[in-house]
Regions:
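Extracellular glycan-interaction surfaces
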Residues: 82-111, 121, 129-140, 158-221
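Extracellular glycan-interaction patches encoded by glycine-rich segments
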Residues: 225-250, 254
């Protein structure tokens, strides 16, 4: 059985439903969408397409490198499996690695990144960012994993390994109006981690690592994201502190609503064996 056949039945759909937000992991072969919560009933997914979403929040970006409907293994486009069509583009030699059910994009820590030419959400609160990430060298400073907005223009927010001049390997949360949160959670090089950040209604935040709540940060102002969304860097690169990831990314999900603990744990448990 070849890899394409294997992926066609392993990359199945999962719904983590609640009254306010739904995360959908699309099937590479399509299928029928689930039933939404109070927001209504989900539709029928097409090939690799999304199903329903519910309540006050929804998945606004979903990239899954192991899913051939999201990345077919060649080319410069990674396709968004949410309802919103926020496709991304691979810049400056981002590499694809076929790794069974845990395929990933490889970033060199110098100039590689994936760019989406829009802010996938303009929310300044009630946001979740979830990613499967593996840093090749956690001691490299300023490794931005995902950034929504323009850090150079001091807006938006993101998740990073280290900030400038820091080599601890700690996960940092960045609010673009010059606020860093040090979670104190150190990652190890060449180790896969499921990172999930909730920015709550008051702009305080909760950080989950591998399905466990590891850090909670206080509220702070956030300026509305502008310009774009980026994976593997932020646009704060014209100064002395470049923000490029040296490592691997396999999945990125952004939701315009926070996830419950049970939703985060369910997604972690449903995907962890791929890594």
């Amino acid at each position: 059985m070849n890899n394409a056949t294997i992926k066609s039945w392993i990359n199945r759909a999962y719904f983590f439903d609640s009254g306010h937000v739904n995360v959908f992991v699309a099937s590479s072969t399509g299928g029928t969408g689930g039933t939404g919560g109070t927001g209504g009933t989900g539709g029928t997914g097409g090939t690799g397409g999304p199903g329903g979403f519910s309540g006050t929040g929804s998945t606004v970006l979903y990239f899954s490198v192991p899913n051939s409907s999201s990345y077919p293994g060649t080319g410069f486009t990674i396709y968004d499996l949410s309802n919103y069509g926020n496709n991304g583009y691979l810049y400056n030699g981002v590499a694809y690695v076929n790794n069974g059910n845990g395929d990933y994009l490889l970033f060199d820590g110098t100039n590689n990144y994936v760019g989406i030419n829009t802010t996938v959400t303009t929310n300044t609160s009630n946001v979740n960012i979830t990613a499967w990430v593996n840093s090749s060298i956690v001691s490299q400073s300023g490794q931005m994993i995902v950034y929504v907005g323009s850090e150079q223009n001091l807006n938006g927010y993101g998740i990073s390994i280290n900030k400038e001049y820091v080599t601890s390997g700690n996960v940092y949360i960045r609010y673009g109006n010059v606020r860093w949160y040090n979670s104190g959670i150190a990652l190890s090089s060449n180790s896969w981690n499921h990172i999930s950040l909730n920015i709550k209604s008051d702009t305080s935040n909760d950080l989950f690592v591998n399905g466990i709540l590891r850090y909670s940060g206080p509220a702070s102002s956030i300026y509305t994201p502008t310009l774009h969304t980026e994976i593997g860097r932020s646009d704060f690169t014209t100064y002395a502190y470049p923000r490029y990831l040296n490592g691997k990314v396999s999945q990125v999900i952004i939701s315009s609503g926070i996830l419950t603990t049970s939703e985060i744990v369910a997604h972690y448990n449903s995907t962890k064996n791929n890594y």
